[in-house]
Amino acid sequence: MQLKIQLLMLVLMTVLTDVYSKDGFIVSKKNCLYRCSQSDERGFCNAVCLRYDADSGYCRTGKCWCDGLPQKANIAMKNKSYC
């Protein structure tokens, strides 16, 4: 019985984490994307993303991509242009 409860809690925590976080290219307060170099092995982008309360970040196609951002975070939309 104890094992079943622990497994249920694990599943619920996983589902809730996915629901309450999002991933994407982070947009600054000035409505700009953070540019980066592909050779930046998680350094700059990870630091930027952590400032926005993300789990981690890395350089993807020359822009900072953040994983595990809070729902309130401003991420880039496909049909919008940024500075």
Curated annotation (Swiss-Prot):
InterPro entries per record: LCN-type_CS_alpha_beta_dom (IPR044062), Scorpion_toxin-like (IPR003614), Scorpion_toxin-like_sf (IPR036574), Scorpion_toxinL (IPR018218), Scorpion_toxinL/defensin (IPR002061)
Signal peptide positions on this chain: 1-21
GO cellular component: extracellular region
SMART domains: Knot1
Protein's name according to its UniProt entry: Neurotoxin LmNaTx35.1
PROSITE patterns membership: LCN_CSAB (PS51863)
Stated role: Binds voltage-independently at site-3 of voltage-gated sodium channels (Nav) and inhibits the inactivation of the activated channels, thereby blocking neuronal transmission.
Biological process (GO), any one: defense response
GO MF annotation list: sodium channel inhibitor activity; toxin activity
Organism (species): Lychas mucronatus (Chinese swimming scorpion)
Domain notes: Has the structural arrangement of an alpha-helix connected to antiparallel beta-sheets by disulfide bonds (CS-alpha/beta).
Residues annotated as domain LCN-type CS-alpha/beta: 22-83
Disulfide bonds: C32-C83, C36-C59, C45-C64, C49-C66
UniProt family annotation: Belongs to the long (4 C-C) scorpion toxin superfamily. Sodium channel inhibitor family. Alpha subfamily.
Subcellular location: Secreted
Superkingdom assignment: Eukaryota
Keyword annotations of the record: Disulfide bond, Ion channel impairing toxin, Neurotoxin, Secreted, Signal, Toxin, Voltage-gated sodium channel impairing toxin
Tissue and organ expression note: Expressed by the venom gland.
CDD domains: neurotoxins_LC_scorpion
